[in-house]
Structures are given as C-alpha cells and as structure tokens.
Amino acid sequence: MSMTSSVRVEWIAAVTIAAGTAAIGYLAYKRFYVKDHRNKSMVNPHIQKDNPKVVHAFDMEDLGDKAVYCRCWRSKKFPLCDGSHTKHNEETGDNVGPLIIKKKDT
C-alpha cells in the first residue's frame, strides 16, 4: 500500500466518523430540544384542559358598555383579560392583546 492510499483511507475513516457523530447529534437535538418547544408553543396552557374545545358565549345585551376578553389564554380571570398578555409578550416576543368589545358611540 502506498503512502497516498493510506492517507486516503484515514480521510475516509475520519469523514465517516464525523458524519456519524453529526447524525447522532442531529437526532438527539430533534428528540430532546425541538420537543420542548412544541409544548411551550401550545396556545392554551391550563384552562379547561379536560374539555375538547373551550367555548364561551355571551349575550350582547349582558356585556354592558365595554367588555375586554383574553386572547393569550394566560389570564387568571379567563375569559376576561387581566393583562397577562403583557408578560406573555415579553417572554415570547409575541404581540397579542385583548379583544375589546364596546358599544358604538352614537
């Protein structure tokens, strides 16, 4: 075996080991890191989790002059807004705000 042939074999072995290590690292990243982000991006973290679909309905006549509803799902007074979206926006970089329903000024 010549000198260039043995160098070529060493390079092939090194590239194979590096590619295998990169593949294992990528699979570990996908398994452990990406999974955590999927759970953190869930819109509703804790409100009525036993219910398959959370729905609230209100009669327009019962709202009064103004009603402010939560859209970030973090409010302790859900479905009403308590300003929790401010902290949520700071933590996530989101820009969600409340839904404000008010009577039209005549």
From Swiss-Prot:
The chain crosses the membrane at residues 10-29. The modification N6-acetyllysine is found at residues 53, 66, 102. [2Fe-2S] cluster binds at residues 70, 72, 81, 85. Ubiquitinated by PRKN during mitophagy, leading to its degradation and enhancement of mitophagy. Deubiquitinated by USP30. One of its GO terms (molecular function) is L-cysteine transaminase activity. It is an enzyme of class 2 (transferase). It catalyses: L-cysteine + 2-oxoglutarate = 2-oxo-3-sulfanylpropanoate + L-glutamate. This is CDGSH iron-sulfur domain-containing protein 1. It comes from Bos taurus.
